[in-house]
Amino acid sequence: MALKTDIRGMIWRYPDYFVVGREQLRQFALSVKNRHPAHFSEDAAAELGHDAIIAPLTFATIFAKLVQLDFFRHVDIGMETLVIVQVDQRFVFSKPIKAGDKLWARMDIVSVDERFGADIVVTKNICTNDDGELVLEAYTTLMSQFNGDQSAKLRWDSESGQVVRTA
């Protein structure tokens, strides 16, 4: 395998919490063209039994990405995240994400396999609220293929927020 570190079975706890913002939910709903009133209006959300506006289902990707980035910043797996592709993601919700929620996360590395020269990593992300109640479980499959060819010489420049050539 190309992975430098044996991450199978590893549990990564995100070191901070994530507070879900009301305007953040509205902006996200607009960006994904989800016009459901419960994403914009407390009254519409209350009609559905919620005490705050609710997040579009795909909003969870915002927090999931933060957890993954934190993991890759701290665990040297021996390759750039630029060669990692997310090939599958599935969310299992226990309760809706709402404005004002304080969320906590942990990522479990469920499996690491090599198939046809590619490393395939499956993670299970567990998201809980501040009361410790399960909000959602997310299952993500990541794939990387690294054959030693670094001819493109690319890297992520965090200052510019872009992929740049190094040579």
UniProtKB/Swiss-Prot annotation:
Q: Give the matching SUPFAM superfamilies.
A: Thioesterase/thiol ester dehydrase-isomerase (SSF54637)
Residue ranges constituting the MaoC-like domain according to the UniProt record: 21-124
Q: Which Pfam families match?
A: FAS1_DH_region (PF13452)
InterPro entries tied to this protein: FAS1-like_DH_region, HadA-like, HotDog_dom_sf
Q: Which family does the record assign?
A: Belongs to the UPF0336 family.
Q: What is this protein's record name?
A: UPF0336 protein MAP_4109
